[in-house]
Swiss-Prot record:
This is Elongation factor P. The lineage of its organism: Bacteria, Pseudomonadati, Pseudomonadota, Alphaproteobacteria, Rickettsiales. Belongs to the elongation factor P family. It is found in: Cytoplasm. One of its GO terms (cellular component) is cytoplasm.
């Protein structure tokens, strides 16, 4: 399926130069001279190699036709992950490397989205938003509110992110996994 270059988004899978690529990051650039373009970081799904590619905003790219299916994470042994289809209860094992650095968000029961191309799993991704507990954070000092200030916090998965000063140890927060940032307090 052909798509305009300006419509490329992270998480999409492109059929480019005869190979499948996962779009990792995109940035729209409009230089003073010449046409606008999209600078994209692509990951080759076969080799795992990453590279930069420019696509004209008014040009077209071929998007791979993939089937996306939700699977529930059951367990992992470090090298592979065992997942269960939430509709058919069929189990599948995938390489832990498919999630890359986003594997830190894995916990029992989380729903992952697997992308199938011609019957093979070609990509896996965690949800855009996950709920995690704060296990360690700095204490806030009164009077530090002249400008928007954030403090460092360690989450239950060991990740360190910046959170607003009102967040305390033991609170559950929503993390935006696309850029690993605080989104809001969990409403549970």
């Amino acid at each position: 399926m052909a798509e305009r270059g300006s419509d490329i988004r992270p998480g999409q899978i492109l059929d480019h130069n005869g190979s499948l690529y996962l779009v990792v990051k995109t940035m729209h650039t409009q230089p003073g001279k010449g046409g606008a373009y999209i600078q994209a970081e692509l990951k080759n799904l076969k080799t795992g190699a990453k590279y930069q590619e420019r696509f004209r905003s008014d040009g077209y790219v071929k998007r791979a036709i993939v089937e996306e299916v939700e699977y529930q994470y059951i367990f992992g042994d470090g090298a592979s992950l065992t997942l269960m289809n939430t509709a058919t209860y069929e189990q599948v094992s995938i390489s832990a490397d498919m999630l890359g650095e986003k594997g830190v968000y894995l916990k029992e029961g989380i729903i992952l989205t697997l992308s199938f191309y011609q019957g093979q799993v070609v990509a896996a991704r965690v949800p855009d938003y996950v709920v995690l507990e704060v296990v360690e954070t700095e204490s806030v000092i009164k009077g530090q509110t002249a400008s928007s200030s954030y403090k460092s916090a360690v989450l239950e998965n060991g990740e360190r992110i910046s959170v607003p000063p009102f967040i305390k140890v033991g609170e559950r927060i929503v993390v935006y996994t696309v850029d690993d940032t605080y989104y809001e307090r969990a409403k549970d």
